[in-house]
Amino acid sequence: MAFSQYISLAPELLLATAIFCLVFWVLRGTRTQVPKGLKSPPGPWGLPFIGHMLTLGKNPHLSLTKLSQQYGDVLQIRIGSTPVVVLSGLNTIKQALVKQGDDFKGRPDLYSFTLITNGKSMTFNPDSGPVWAARRRLAQDALKSFSIASDPTSVSSCYLEEHVSKEANHLISKFQKLMAEVGHFEPVNQVVESVANVIGAMCFGKNFPRKSEEMLNLVKSSKDFVENVTSGNAVDFFPVLRYLPNPALKRFKNFNDNFVLFLQKTVQEHYQDFNKNSIQDITGALFKHSENYKDNGGLIPQEKIVNIVNDIFGAGFETVTTAIFWSILLLVTEPKVQRKIHEELDTVIGRDRQPRLSDRPQLPYLEAFILEIYRYTSFVPFTIPHSTTRDTSLNGFHIPKECCIFINQWQVNHDEKQWKDPFVFRPERFLTNDNTAIDKTLSEKVMLFGLGKRRCIGEIPAKWEVFLFLAILLHQLEFTVPPGVKVDLTPSYGLTMKPRTCEHVQAWPRFSK
């Protein structure tokens, strides 16, 4: 080749060399020193600049489950230039989140997290120190006190039972009204409103604006939240996307801003008639803790209350709403299952009273149905991302400090090593051999609320709420769809995954009151 030809190719050669050097620098920058005796987690080769973003696709839980079958329970991918370790397998996840919980209790400093309550959310904030732990305990105690604790002024066994019973009966009335008017309905918005009223009553008591249009519009737009707080959201790993037109991100910002303003206003109104000698809701309990904050070193200054209430509201809302919606759709597609639940309710409850929380141990088939909803749908496919708080190791692999960790709950719930026919909806799998109780060992293998030090603070109240809502609804109603209507159970990926809306659900009274 003539020298002149080399000269003509110089710009292309320089560009290729520059690209190669940049790629090499990026890849080298993501590598860490691995201590002797340990290995780096395995994983596939990624593309320059974008890493494995395209590999994740529209359903990252499925893509990463497939990769785990090839690379094992601890694998590593890159999203952009950020290394992400993906954990699968129940035993591996328990080892990380429970036995090595202090190592894996962090949160990554993701951009989308900074938009939630102005970056001060207890659930999404990277802080995992002693102040965070103490505030988390206080939030858990407040939630417990005004949900499963006894209400001395009510005939109900606890606050939660009182609020759910009231809202479940309202929901039945709304369904029957829609049946009389149209003959079918779309259940999501009705369920959203009822569940929001329950958690709102527990948070604010009589101060919660039950029929506020502002509140209803906010909770009905919660999809703008769950679509953005997802494992693998591109905006968290590619900063340039924050400055480009992004309608979904704009809706997410607006939702968070508006919801915080709504909570600030409601909390402030609540404070006007706060009486420390008569605590009747979660916010009141938090006010009491905040009163002596400066005097005795308490852990909740008043300005933090909105942030904590926001976390509690979220913990008691999205999971319950999604579980009930999935339940209704699977009831209409599995009529034999619905019939068995009806038979159990008729035998145990009869027709002279409503189900109560105390009936739960005597309704094992309904409980098995709910567990199978959690497992089969796995509608929380990943936990909120974790991060490591220090250099650590897992299964012989080195994981550096501040490494982003994805926990694949969907894989755990569909692991063929743990479950027979995992892709079949079969509530009976959770019953003991004599069908009289729940197989506790098997039920503890279901993952939906996370594990360890970041386990969802609303797990117990949420499970009780789902049970009582469904028990009351199914005691009174039979759910169907008209002949020929097909229900699409294909979920849309997000923090919580919901199936497509079905506008042709029907609810028929089972007996006259």
Swiss-Prot record:
Compartments where found: Endoplasmic reticulum membrane; Microsome membrane
Record membrane topology: Peripheral membrane protein
Substrates-to-products reaction catalysed: an organic molecule + reduced [NADPH--hemoprotein reductase] + O2 = an alcohol + oxidized [NADPH--hemoprotein reductase] + H2O + H(+); 17beta-estradiol + reduced [NADPH--hemoprotein reductase] + O2 = 2-hydroxy-17beta-estradiol + oxidized [NADPH--hemoprotein reductase] + H2O + H(+); 17beta-estradiol + reduced [NADPH--hemoprotein reductase] + O2 = 4-hydroxy-17beta-estradiol + oxidized [NADPH--hemoprotein reductase] + H2O + H(+); estrone + reduced [NADPH--hemoprotein reductase] + O2 = 2-hydroxyestrone + oxidized [NADPH--hemoprotein reductase] + H2O + H(+)
Gene3D superfamilies xrefs: Cytochrome P450
Top-rank taxon, per record: Eukaryota
Any Pfam family the entry gives: p450
Identification of the protein by name: Cytochrome P450 1A2
Family from the record: Belongs to the cytochrome P450 family.
Co-factor(s): heme
Enzyme nomenclature, EC number: 1.14.14.1, 4.2.1.152
Assembly and binders: Interacts with PGRMC1; the interaction requires PGRMC1 homodimerization.
Pathway listed: Cofactor metabolism; retinol metabolism; Steroid metabolism; cholesterol metabolism; Lipid metabolism; arachidonate metabolism
Stated role: A cytochrome P450 monooxygenase involved in the metabolism of various endogenous substrates, including fatty acids, steroid hormones and vitamins. Mechanistically, uses molecular oxygen inserting one oxygen atom into a substrate, and reducing the second into a water molecule, with two electrons provided by NADPH via cytochrome P450 reductase (NADPH--hemoprotein reductase). Catalyzes the hydroxylation of carbon-hydrogen bonds. Exhibits high catalytic activity for the formation of hydroxyestrogens from estrone (E1) and 17beta-estradiol (E2), namely 2-hydroxy E1 and E2.
Keywords: Endoplasmic reticulum, Fatty acid metabolism, Glycoprotein, Heme, Iron, Lipid metabolism, Lyase, Membrane, Metal-binding, Microsome, Monooxygenase, Oxidoreductase, Steroid metabolism, Sterol metabolism
Glycosylation sites: S68
Main location: endoplasmic reticulum
GO cellular component, one term: intracellular membrane-bounded organelle
Binding, heme: C456
GO BP, sorted A to Z: alkaloid metabolic process; arachidonate metabolic process; cellular respiration; cellular response to cadmium ion; cellular response to copper ion; cholesterol metabolic process; dibenzo-p-dioxin metabolic process; estrogen metabolic process
